[in-house]
Design a protein with these regions (language model features):
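Conserved catalytic alpha/beta core of Sir2/sirtuin-type deacylases, generalized to analogous enzyme cores
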Residues: 1-160
Length: 160
């Protein structure tokens, strides 16, 4: 496993010890000041009932480390994602009921290299709406939990 590109902001993969993790949309486990860069753990804010004002520069409100509507992903995380995608032999995507534009762009990167993509989803995605020209893309309609159990059984601790 080269790594995991995560598009969730819950931070659960990191909390559970995932290695080689790129949290493309950030996570809500820490807040930061966009003026001076000071950061603070979310748990400290909750436990101490701290204000969201920056304790360092006193000029800004702390915000979670996630992109908001209209903001781009961090460029270094995008670069790391592209490097990982350009090195992988297989791309496995766990999807709910849709594929985001960034996910589709990741599939395109892997598809151009003639590598395999498996899209695991418990609900039926309308694969006809996607313009995937390759036969290297498979939709697997199974729960993510069952598929993960199969991966863990096959690869053990090498998954994370």
């Amino acid at each position: 496993i080269l790594g995991v590109i995560n598009l969730n902001i819950d931070g659960l993969l990191k909390l559970n010890g995932a290695q080689k993790l790129i949290e493309l949309e950030g996570n809500i486990s820490w807040f930061y000041c966009s003026k001076c860069g000071m950061d603070k753990d979310t748990n400290l804010i909750i436990q101490n009932k701290d204000e969201f004002a920056c304790n360092s520069c006193h000029k800004n409100i702390l915000k979670p480390s996630i992109p908001f509507v209209g903001q781009e992903f961090s460029q270094w995380d995008m670069k790391d994602s592209w490097m990982m995608l350009n090195s992988c032999d297989n791309l496995i995507i766990f999807a709910d009921n849709f594929l985001s534009p960034v996910t589709i762009s990741f599939i395109d990167i892997v598809e151009k290299r003639m590598k395999n993509t498996k899209i695991i989803c418990s609900e039926s995605l309308n694969s006809d709406i996607f313009d995937f020209s390759s036969n290297n893309i498979d939709f697997i309609y199974e729960s993510s939990d069952l598929f993960l159990d199969s991966l863990i059984e096959a690869f053990g601790d090498n998954i994370i």
